Amino acid sequence: MAERTFIAIKPDGVQRGLVGEILGRFERKGFKLVGLKQITPSRALAEQHYGVHKERPFFAGLVDFITSGPVVAMVWEGDGVIASARKLIGATKPLEAEPGTIRGDLAVNIGRNVIHGSDAAETAQFEIGLWFQASELNDWSPSDQGWRVEG
């Protein structure tokens, strides 16, 4: 199976109508969407998701923000998708993100940086399992697969 990553369009991205733009960037890159849903996360889900930041001063605000509205949760699949997605997304601080990246083009403030992406294989596995049931992920082959990747 190809590598998978978890991507979430945060409430600011949903409210600003950026879902289609962001989905398009991943599709044009050639990655395969295997899971997609819109959900307003519970506090429990948000606290689990951001658990690594529990002792940080911004934790409560982060949880409040991510639970403030709908999030579009996605699982993308493809060769090197985790590293490639991180490049597509750009630096966490939008003012440090390169033009052409999602955050470089669409975000201004670290507290409203539009999107989350897993940073490693272990994180992706944890986040996918947290946000999705196995039955919600679709194993399928695009008809243009031979035009996307060699082999």
UniProtKB/Swiss-Prot annotation:
Pfam families: NDK (PF00334). InterPro entries: NDK-like_dom, NDK-like_dom_sf, Nucleoside_diP_kinase. One of its GO terms (biological process) is GTP biosynthetic process. The keyword Magnesium applies. One of its GO terms (cellular component) is cytoplasm. The active site is at residue 116. ATP binds at residues 10, 58, 86, 92, 103, 113. Pathway: Purine metabolism. It is an enzyme of class 2 (transferase). Its cofactor is Mg(2+). SUPFAM superfamilies: Nucleoside diphosphate kinase, NDK. Keywords: ATP-binding, Cytoplasm, Kinase, Magnesium, Metal-binding, Nucleotide metabolism, Nucleotide-binding, Phosphoprotein, Transferase. It catalyses: dZDP + ATP = dZTP + ADP; a 2'-deoxyribonucleoside 5'-diphosphate + ATP = a 2'-deoxyribonucleoside 5'-triphosphate + ADP; a ribonucleoside 5'-diphosphate + ATP = a ribonucleoside 5'-triphosphate + ADP. NCBIfam families: PRK00668.1. Major role in the synthesis of nucleoside triphosphates other than ATP. The ATP gamma phosphate is transferred to the NDP beta phosphate via a ping-pong mechanism, using a phosphorylated active-site intermediate. (Microbial infection) Catalyzes the phosphorylation of dZDP to dZTP, when the bacterium is infected by a phage that produces the substrate for the synthesis of dZTP (2- amino-2'-deoxyadenosine 5'-triphosphate), which is then used by the phage as a DNA polymerase substrate. This is Nucleoside diphosphate kinase. It comes from Synechococcus sp. (strain CC9605). The gene is ndk.
